[in-house]
Amino acid sequence: MADYTNYTKQEMQAYAIAKNIKENQIVIVGTGLPLIGASLAKRAVCPSCHPIVESGLMDCSPVEVPRSVGDLRFMAHCGVQWPNIRFVGFEANEWLHDEDRLVAFIGGAQIDPYGNVNSTCIFGKGDYLQP
């Protein structure tokens, strides 16, 4: 009999992400554990979900676990390859018309010290207002 109690916190997080994705749901996915969780959902939990990533790839069906949202292995198995501007427009339009079908998972690396998503600002040694 298999021991299903021997798992890491990261494995449980990826599984929890996969289990929270519903059939036919559009899933905006960030790098890291969200990408692993969405890949697991697409392959094992609900194959009809539609993962999309900020690099413009939609309805991705990865054969291997991609390292990032721009991984070429990820690009080879997706339904649509859009420029980023179309991705943002699609996301906004979908939220306005059918918000129940849209869910997003982002990783901790995508959140700055002020709680903003990295599209707001990521800075190193500089000032927050002038990174």
Residue map of PLM features:
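N-terminal active-site beta-alpha-beta segment that forms phosphate/nucleotide-binding
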Residues: M1-W82
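Conserved phosphate- and dinucleotide-binding cores of soluble alpha/beta proteins
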Residues: A2, K9, V65-P131
